[in-house]
């Protein structure tokens, strides 16, 4: 079965609307990560339960995880023009990722850090997004 790609025609954005867009993207991504019925693969949504049963130091697993996450986010978030996913920490009880995001009509990269904490994802950078 072929997957349909979604393309969005986005309006030009300037000034303080860019800041609002960046905050909106981060807020929407955090909601997506914490949604129990998210369309993201289960490892990406529930994070730690599945992560703990695997060898977290396995570089192939880490690479696979980043590729899966990148693919899912690009599919579900049409406002992202380019995305790089990096694992910052990958231990049995800690999973921290960093998303380097380029948005359409925004020349500055957006860095969004997420940490799996007490059964859910949280962001240390959401309040600092501008």
From Swiss-Prot:
Q: What is its main location?
A: cytoplasm
The molecular function GO annotations come to:
anti-sigma factor antagonist activity
Q: Name one Pfam family in it.
A: GPW_gp25
- Location(s) in or outside the cell: Cytoplasm
**SUPFAM superfamilies, from UniProt?**
gpW/gp25-like (SSF160719)
What InterPro entries would the database entry show?
Anti-adapt_IraD, IraD/Gp25-like
- A single GO BP annotation from the record? cellular response to oxidative stress
Q: Provide the Gene Ontology terms for cellular component.
A: cytoplasm
Q: Which UniProt keywords apply?
A: Cytoplasm, Stress response
Highest taxon in the source lineage: Bacteria
Q: Family membership, please give it.
A: Belongs to the GpW/Gp25 family. IraD subfamily.
In UniProt terms, what function does this protein have? Inhibits RpoS proteolysis by regulating RssB activity, thereby increasing the stability of the sigma stress factor RpoS during oxidative stress. Its effect on RpoS stability is due to its interaction with RssB, which probably blocks the interaction of RssB with RpoS, and the consequent delivery of the RssB-RpoS complex to the ClpXP protein degradation pathway.
Q: How does it assemble?
A: Interacts with RssB.
UniProt xrefs under HAMAP family: IraD
Q: What is this protein called?
A: Anti-adapter protein IraD
Natural source organism: Escherichia coli O45:K1 (strain S88 / ExPEC)
Lineage of the species this protein comes from: Bacteria, Pseudomonadati, Pseudomonadota, Gammaproteobacteria, Enterobacterales
């Amino acid at each position: 079965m072929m997957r349909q790609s979604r393309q969005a025609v986005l309006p030009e954005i300037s000034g303080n609307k860019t800041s609002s867009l960046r905050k909106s993207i981060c807020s929407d991504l955090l909601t997506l990560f914490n949604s129990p019925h998210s369309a993201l693969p289960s490892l990406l949504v529930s994070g730690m339960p599945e992560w703990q049963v695997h060898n977290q130091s396995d570089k192939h697993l880490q690479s696979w995880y980043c590729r899966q996450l990148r693919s899912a986010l690009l599919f579900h978030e049409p406002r992202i023009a380019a995305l790089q996913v990096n694992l910052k920490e990958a231990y049995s009880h800690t999973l921290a990722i960093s998303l380097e995001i380029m948005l359409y009509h925004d020349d500055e990269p957006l860095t969004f850090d997420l940490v799996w904490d007490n059964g859910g994802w949280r962001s240390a950078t959401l309040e600092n997004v501008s």
